[in-house]
Amino acid sequence: GTYYHAGKMLQQLGKPEQAEKVYRTGLTVARRAGQLHAASELQQALNQLLGLDYEDDE
């Protein structure tokens, strides 16, 4: 949860580039550790940051 919360905090502080780096690092760490739930949450947060969360368009 640390990478997720750090990324969200950076987003709230208006630092999306840094948030993206944190999410991507967290994704790598979570996948290597086999933490698929954490990786999924980080991927969703990254997609939202990048405007790739299509569910909101409906």
Regions found by a protein language model. Name each.
Residues 56-58:
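Alpha-helical repeat scaffolds
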